[in-house]
Amino acid sequence: MLRIADKTFDSHLFTGTGKFASSQLMMEAIRASGSQLVTLAMKRVNLRQHNDAILEPLIAAGVTLLPNTSGVKTAEEAIFAAHLAREALGTNWLKLEIHPDARWLLPDPIETLKAAETLVQQGFVVLPYCGADPVLCKRLEEVGCAAVMPLGAPIGSNQGLETRAMLEIIIQQATVPVVVDAGIGVPSHAAQALEMGADAVLVNTAIAVADDPVNMAKAFRLAVDAGLLARQSGPGSRSHFAHATSPLTGFLEASA
């Protein structure tokens, strides 16, 4: 069971809504993933009416909606977008996302921290997308963010856990949930994140652009469950040396 702020989730896999060939395929994949929290970019939905092709089926499915501020470049723009989302969707949950460079889509740490502090004070449940910076993640936690979402690699790159060393530090020091977001490309990446101690992963591109998004979503669901179960089972320690699993000479001595 995963708790973030006032909500609990059975699934440790969060999903997105971008890049799917159709809203029907999107919903089939989300159902197959078992995800109970789904992000959506405010720039992609019609906030004036709930019969939007993306929004309507998500509301009907009963998943927790996590609007994100993708596309904004400053703290001020993010705060404005957050209030629009809260008014339109009736949720104070927000994935804070500020990336001014459209080529790399890397989060701006200064603007993110500034916006996070203000939004928390204004009653939002803030989940910030951020770089895998242990110092920044601790600062975001200190200003009241409900979780931190450090990247594994650049958004949509499918490179996996390129920031593993920093993620390990973030996980070790965090007192709020850590959700690895961005760069996860295959189910084994997700399993590794859960094994190393992450509380959840957010996956969008790897599922949406797969040849078979529905089966890929199932694969991610199984991988996340496997990674979590492996961690809870207490993996053996690593060693530079070999350790025999059975006596090497006992049977020889016994027969001598």
Curated annotation (Swiss-Prot):
Known pathway: Cofactor biosynthesis; thiamine diphosphate biosynthesis
EC code: 2.8.1.10
GO molecular function: thiazole synthase activity
One GO-annotated biological process of the protein: thiamine diphosphate biosynthetic process
Main location group: cytoplasm
Catalytic activity: [ThiS sulfur-carrier protein]-C-terminal-Gly-aminoethanethioate + 2-iminoacetate + 1-deoxy-D-xylulose 5-phosphate = [ThiS sulfur-carrier protein]-C-terminal Gly-Gly + 2-[(2R,5Z)-2-carboxy-4-methylthiazol-5(2H)-ylidene]ethyl phosphate + 2 H2O + H(+)
Keyword Metal-binding: no
Classification via InterPro entries: Aldolase_TIM, Thiazole_synthase_ThiG, ThiG
Binding site for 1-deoxy-D-xylulose 5-phosphate: 156, 182-183, 204-205
UniProt keyword terms in alphabetical order: Cytoplasm, Schiff base, Thiamine biosynthesis, Transferase
Active-site residues from the entry: 95 (schiff-base intermediate with dxp)
Gene Ontology terms: cellular component: cytoplasm
Subcellular location: Cytoplasm
UniProt-listed Gene3D superfamilies: Aldolase class I (3.20.20.70)
Assembly and oligomerization: Homotetramer. Forms heterodimers with either ThiH or ThiS.
Job of this protein: Catalyzes the rearrangement of 1-deoxy-D-xylulose 5-phosphate (DXP) to produce the thiazole phosphate moiety of thiamine. Sulfur is provided by the thiocarboxylate moiety of the carrier protein ThiS. In vitro, sulfur can be provided by H(2)S.
Similarity comment: family membership: Belongs to the ThiG family.
HAMAP family xref list: ThiG
Protein name, per record: Thiazole synthase
The organism of origin for this protein: Escherichia coli O7:K1 (strain IAI39 / ExPEC)
Gene giving rise to this polypeptide: thiG
